[in-house]
Amino acid sequence: MVKKIHFVMERHASIVAFLLAVLALTESQAFTSVKLPRDEHWPYNYVSVGPAGVWAVNRQNKLFYRTGTYGDNANMGSGWQFKQDGVGQVDVGKDKVGYINLSGGSLFRIEGISQANPVGGTPKSWEWWTKYIGMSLREDTRFSSRIENQNKVLTFTFRTCFWASRITNWCFADSSYTETVTAGGSGTWITKSQLKYKSGTFGNPDTEGGDWILVDSGSFQHVSSGSGVVLAVRSNGELVQRTGITCSLPQGTGWTSMLNSMSRVDTYGTVAWAVDTAGDLYFINL
């Protein structure tokens, strides 16, 4: 009888260990990635995905729209349509795209983007002295965030005033050195070597939120907030996904490693796009 009990216990322990191993394997392989073939526009610097499709900037500072991706984020698309020269960084919003012009660090936005016209109209000047833009996914661009030339994060208030095509009332959201900012379904996050989350923005990033919460004191170079998912690139190039994100714990609990030698990432819906250090693009199903 004692031997039988020990056998049953050992058998259950083996089953539990096997299930845990399968679960760990499933978590580590819960995504698929496709490395896009190099084309005449390679190498690339930035890529962004959103309701207005996939947009990328190559190392010649040319801005392109990925054909066939407007309103269909799960579609990898095919080929590129040229839009603009002299672009440093791009971020996709809802039927709008924001980008940084390298000449003077000016911020521009492209409006009028639609299924019939996925590259939109003529870019409009939006703001000067900008290093980075994080577009809102709302129709109302007042809730976007930007990093100005002194590396401070600025966002809009609800009382933002419009004058012609310019928006005139930005407010400080973080006054210390900041590298990247993102606003998505999992809230507003920033990298300033360390990684921080703005409390009160989970599920509704278009609010001013509360205090910044330190998530990870490690060194990060990029972050992207999506619907229930946060992806980040460490300074060593490791692409990681934040685990344990819930409504009650929006900053999550840990990390899952995905890819190496990455430099930028952006996520929307069930997919992500990334750029590696060689300038190659990756399409990732989450």
From Swiss-Prot:
One of its GO terms (molecular function) is toxin activity. InterPro entries: Beta-propeller_rpt_TECPR, Tectonin_beta-propeller. Perivitellin-2 is a dimer of heterodimers held together head-to-tail by non-covalent forces. The heterodimer is composed of the tachylectin subunit (31 kDa) and the MACPF subunit (67 kDa) that are disulfide-linked. The egg defensive protein perivitellin-2 is a pore-forming two-subunit glycoprotein that affects both the nervous and digestive systems of mammals. In addition, it is a source of both structural and energetic molecules during embryonic development. The tachylectin subunit (31 kDa) binds target membranes while the MACPF subunit (67 kDa) disrupts lipid bilayers forming large pores (inner diameter of about 5.6 nm) altering the plasma membrance conductance. It is found in: Secreted; Target cell membrane. It comes from the Eukaryota. Belongs to the tectonin family. The keyword Membrane applies. Residues 1-30 form the signal peptide. PV2 is a very high density lipoprotein (VHDL). It contains 3.75% of lipids. The major lipid classes are free sterols and phospholipids and also have significant quantities of energy-providing triacylglycerides and free fatty acids. This is Perivitellin-2 31 kDa subunit. Produced by albumen secretory cells. Found in developing eggs. GO terms for cellular component: extracellular region; membrane; other organism cell membrane. Glycans are attached at N101.
